[in-house]
Amino acid sequence: MVNVQHYLTLVAMAGAVVTNADQTYFQGDGTPYDLDKVGHGNCAFMSSWSKAVTNYVAVNQAQWDDLTHCGQCIEATCIDAKCKNRNTAVTLQVVDRCPQCQYGDLDMSPSALIKIVGSNPGRIKIGWKYVDCPEPGTIKFCLKTGSNKWWVAIQPTNTRIGVKSLSINGKAGKMLDGAYYYYIESEDVVPFNKIKVAVTSINGDVVSGTYSMKEGECVDTKQQF
């Protein structure tokens, strides 16, 4: 992993984005915001990383990419001269979108922002990158309420890294507008007691299996990327 101080130097030298050792770093404003429940973010998670309750983040509109970053983890560090804890990094899970934030900006849980700043600044300069989620447990597949035998929406959660695609009974899922679910429409009946799901990571790893699922509930794959 790149040394934090080295990272801060790189960010300061480069402006908006720095690429080093296959890592892309961004900088922008970090601001605090309250989210009462992880599932109330735009990703609408039915299950999430265990630390997301206190370590959540909303990505700016320009880097939101239509929900594709939901569930990924971000490591953020303060790069502002006013910060007391410039060598402290915090890991956060993407659960929401910040429509008014500019490119590079993040809305963060207040406790996480205080940890990297040393106080509650309101707004501060930060640097950040995408990282593997630490100790994510195993991947879960969650069946959206409202799914039926001809329209099925499934959410992959607790993934270590980002998701590239998801298929249901061999059919490529499409991203649902407004919430992090992949869905299919089928002319053939999809039995909930025997749904084949395969999820592919951004690195090409695949987790798959056949599961008995219920609306509004998640099943544990007992696997991880």
Language-model regions, residue ranges each:
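Mature exported/compartmentalized surface modules and terminal targeting/interaction regions
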Residues: 2-104, 111-225
